[in-house]
Amino acid sequence: METTENTKKIGKREFVGIVTSDKMNKTIVVEVRTKKLHKLYKKYVSSSKKYKAHDEENTAHIGDTVRIVEHKPISKDKAWMLTEVIERAK
């Protein structure tokens, strides 16, 4: 009898957001905006959340659109890492 292993690839969460601060060394603050449908009023409610992400080469600047991915905790507040800069600020 053969045993088949059911292996699942656990995907890491990833977000696209706008850099709001790059003042810290190797750290950026990314604001991620989401829209959700309100159950009772059937209107879209927008909300935003800020994440601190690790930027190894200090490549991102304020206003850039970036993609961040979940990572093991790097410090008390940082558990996200910059993967790519999608669009530079004008």
UniProtKB/Swiss-Prot annotation:
The keyword Lyase does not apply. Transmembrane segments: none annotated. Signal peptide: none annotated. Coiled coil: none annotated. One of its GO terms (molecular function) is rRNA binding. One of its GO terms (biological process) is translation. It comes from the Bacteria. One of its GO terms (cellular component) is cytosolic small ribosomal subunit. Keywords: Ribonucleoprotein, Ribosomal protein, RNA-binding, rRNA-binding. The keyword Ribosomal protein applies. PANTHER family: 40S RIBOSOMAL PROTEIN S11 FAMILY MEMBER (PTHR10744), SMALL RIBOSOMAL SUBUNIT PROTEIN US17M (PTHR10744:SF1). Belongs to the universal ribosomal protein uS17 family. One of the primary rRNA binding proteins, it binds specifically to the 5'-end of 16S ribosomal RNA. Part of the 30S ribosomal subunit. This is Small ribosomal subunit protein uS17. It comes from Treponema denticola (strain ATCC 35405 / DSM 14222 / CIP 103919 / JCM 8153 / KCTC 15104).
